[in-house]
Regions:
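Short acidic-glycine-tyrosine-enriched beta hairpin
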Residues: 70-85
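Glycine- and acidic-residue-biased ligand/ion/polar-headgroup-sensing regions
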Residues: 53-64, 69
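Ligand-binding loop in jelly-roll beta-barrel domains
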Residues: 85-110
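Histidine-centered active-site/metal-ligand motif
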Residues: 49-51, 55, 89
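Conserved GNAT-family N-acetyltransferase fold
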Residues: 38, 57, 81
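A short, N-terminal "cap"/entry segment at the start of jelly-roll beta-barrel domains
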Residues: 1-32, 113-125
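Conserved short histidine dyad/triad with adjacent acidic residue
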Residues: 36-50
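Short strand-coil-strand connectors
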Residues: 31, 67-71, 94
Length: 125
């Protein structure tokens, strides 16, 4: 791999994917892990879903309500969390936008291309 393909900026680039209305991601895939910079607009919802990948998240900007395994957690800039495989999770913003850095291991293969939706994740009921 060239140096150019190994260095990125949080504010630009990546593979663009609309996860839900008002929830947009820029994805940076690697061999064994994947980073996703997710911008969640005010009063938007990331549907509760589950997938086989472990996921870590860091709230970079703003605040939101993170729902994990049926429990609501108020997260603000600087907070981070771990979501084990197959645990239902999602969230919603309040009056301001939120930016979250998600880390997936292994990478979510369906996120290696631009598109929309949550890929092969199972929507929780």
């Amino acid at each position: 791999m060239s140096d150019e393909s190994c260095f990125h900026n949080l504010h630009e680039g990546g593979i663009v994917r609309q996860l839900a209305a008002g929830v947009n991601a820029r994805i940076f895939p690697g061999v064994n892990a994947m980073l996703s910079v997710v911008t969640i607009e005010p009063r938007s919802v990331s549907p509760v879903h589950a997938h086989a990948n472990e996921q870590w998240g860091v709230c970079l900007e703003g605040e939101w309500i993170r729902i994990q395994d049926g429990v609501e957690h108020h997260c603000k800039a600087g907070d981070f969390w771990q979501t084990p495989p197959h645990v239902p999770h999602g969230g919603r913003t309040l009056d301001t936008r939120c930016v979250v850095l998600d880390i997936f291991a292994p990478p979510r293969e369906e996120y290696r291309q631009a598109g929309s939706g949550l890929g092969d994740a199972t929507l929780a009921r």
